[in-house]
Amino acid sequence: MCIRDSLIIFSGNLFCLQPEVKGIDSFKPKNILMVGNSFIYFNNGMHNPLEALVKKDLELEKNFKIRKITISGASLSWLEIKSYVSNPNIGSFTFDNENNLINLSVEPFDVLIMHDCSRCPINKKSDFHRIIKKHSNDLKEIGIEPVLMMTWPYKDEPKMIEVLSNEYIKAANENKILVIPVGLAFAKANEKFSKINLYTSDNRHPSKAGTYLGACVIFSALYKKSPENNPYHFGLEPEIAKNLQKLAWEVTEKFYK
């Protein structure tokens, strides 16, 4: 599918690279690890609203766990992803309100969602494609499904999305993995809902609305269902949350057609 009127026109330059993988192999994944940098760390993490959306959905599994590992400013080349998924201590315990240590059962991750630094895909000197191939192969060897999360353009550099989207889709196609179009949803929301600020004051990191939009797009892509009418709004005004839910589904559904 070309991203034409249905999504975005970029200064008359039509973006026509299509994602080859339309969904994940894991049916309704129960254990997910998100790996990246501050883009998914802000607002107490993108994983938290994603988990809440899943748990508030009447049709999805309630025994759902999602973890997040981030390094500030990190490229995927900084992250030892294979060591994270093989570490038996990740998610193995918690503490109650009285400081008692509670051991938890640890199940292997079904899916790992990763993203690179904001400029890595658009810099010719970066090793974006090489490192995604490495991580994808490592994960597939141990039975974990790799997924890419397309990052978003800076608020003051909207045309970044042209190269970002192309490089993320190209990398996904090269490795036969799913790419989630969070960046395209940001671009569309910036165009359609200019009064909803998806960014913090640095014009790069997500505001609470931006984090929620990202979670809604990931939800839509993983579960192939709309987050519309989900009662979890991440503390946003209901009208804003509902607009972002609807847009997330529209962008995701059209992206995979």
Regions found by a protein language model. Give the residues of each.
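Conserved small/polar residues in nucleotide/adenosyl-binding loops
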Residues: 1-6
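Alpha-helical cap/lid subdomain in secreted, periplasmic
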Residues: 96-208, 212, 216, 220, ...
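Soluble non-cytosolic domains of exported or imported proteins
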Residues: 26-30, 40-48, 122, 126-130, ...
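Conserved catalytic region of serine esterases and O-acyltransferases that act on ester linkages
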Residues: 205, 216-257
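Conserved SGNH/GDSL esterase-like catalytic core that processes O-acyl groups on lipids
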Residues: 31, 41-126
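Short hydrophobic segments within beta-strands
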Residues: 35-36, 149
